[in-house]
From Swiss-Prot:
Taxonomic lineage: Archaea, Methanobacteriati, Methanobacteriota, Stenosarchaea group, Methanomicrobia
Protein name: Large ribosomal subunit protein uL16
Pfam families per the UniProt record, alphabetical: Ribosomal_L16
PROSITE patterns for the chain: RIBOSOMAL_L10E (PS01257)
Keyword terms, alphabetized: Ribonucleoprotein, Ribosomal protein
Family stated for the protein in its record: Belongs to the universal ribosomal protein uL16 family.
GO MF terms, alphabetically ordered: structural constituent of ribosome
Length: 173
């Protein structure tokens, strides 16, 4: 089956659906790394964060695409140990889909909207307005590279994003 567009799952329409104990066959999250770069160095003077501006659900595939993009840009511009990046949300929400048969004779094999609860097809992270998604810590000379990496990550997400400076704003003025 083809994957449905993210716009089907972007809006928060109902209560959370997270209790995996009662569900069979929840697909695993594609996001496997939440901390990247120099994890031991805690003395980076500048910290930037990517905030979402609207309440929405972000699929695990979009989070992974944003993480890979930001990580690749940071490695190219700062080196493997020139930054620390953290993904701050986890895709707890289980997404369902009521699959429909199409083609000749589909009306005989499908049950339409009877028993339409749906099968588990993926996971998503529910985020609120102004919640931090990514945080990047860098040295002063790598500030522009970190900002560019977060901008590219924001382009992969289904909501408008904003970059804010958490620490070290006086160093980049």
């Amino acid at each position: 089956m083809v994957r449905k567009p993210g716009s089907m799952y972007r809006n928060v329409r109902q209560r959370s659906f997270t209790r995996r104990k009662y569900m069979g066959g929840v697909p695993g999250s594609q996001v496997i790394h939440y901390d990247m770069g120099d994890k031991a160095n805690t003395s980076f003077p500048i910290k930037l964060s990517l905030l979402v501006e609207e309440k929405c659900q972000i699929r695990h595939t979009a989070l992974e695409a944003a993480r890979i993009t930001a990580n690749r840009h940071l490695i190219e511009d700062t080196g493997k140990m020139g930054y620390y990046m953290k993904l701050r949300v986890y895709p707890h929400e289980v997404l369902r889909e009521n699959k429909q048969a199409t083609g000749a004779g589909a009306d005989r094999v499908s049950s339409g909207m009877r028993r339409a609860f749906g099968k588990n097809v993926g996971t998503a992270a529910r985020v609120n307005p102004f919640q931090k998604i990514f945080t990047v810590a860098v040295e002063k000379q790598n500030f522009v590279a970190a900002k560019k990496a977060l901008w590219h990550a924001g382009q992969k997400l289904p909501t408008p994003c904003r970059i804010v400076i958490d620490e070290g704003a006086e160093l980049v003025q």
